[in-house]
């Protein structure tokens, strides 16, 4: 079901609680990758142009309240959202073509925050301090939800990377506002995610063959998404360390490769579907690589020697996977094929990334995370039909057949 979006909302003169994802990589106050800020601009610009009073919210990093007070203070200092303001203001003014007043509120609740919101004029923005400064945010605390919702007349969710979490800012606030008859909608970024990933959930007959490429370390992390994809896909290409659990389940010697012994029966069972494709050769080494000078050697999948571990798919596998990808009409990729940050073990990831990027007749999607970073680094990201902004969220959306808490709570069109 299509969700109401920012275009559907009448927000002139109204306070809009906007949940963005400004969880950007940074060193001190220097932002090292502004992609998430840039991605949020179309939604914020739309609200500015509509004359909304905008309360912007986001998290930045993690805060573990089980730590000592000193450690918590250090985490809060690292997660101070004020570093976002200069880049946000610059990007927004470039988009709307005029000056926009953007202020920062260091408070996350209480009189200071309430006054900052009351002081907004139409088309102005206040960015609230990191939502995770509040212990109750990640617990969907009803009292915090009540306070934040009381500040707003409407709600917009544009934080896809957090939509698989039932937090106050992604779930509690819109739930309360909806119960009061106030409007809710998704932003342009979330709308694009719903539409693009939706094609991987509801893959029509004309969009087959449908090929999924799954990498990463653990089968256990991907059980639910594998089960969902088995119902939809024609082939699932397995790479990364999770491949060695499958290979061991089939009776291959895997040396010291990472394996989940408690998943062997499950791996064997789903291999029987006939849709799982495994590496026929691997790049191995005696130890996990510590730096970029590490080297490896190629061996067949049934010949990994004792004392050696698999760290990438081999050249025959890469060629085979590339051929399967080239014949696909829909491709979903999540997870590198090996230790892709080390050159000797990056070729498998490069091969699948290149094959998907060059399949111009296919609808190609990267499910965020390490795969998105790899595609960007290799210069292929722009050739994909869609690069998701949320790794965990994209996987959960696929395994839950298009449902996520932060999206489901938004009203339908």
Residue ranges and their predicted role:
Residues 1-413:
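Active-site loop-to-helix "anion-binding N-cap" substructures in soluble metabolic enzymes
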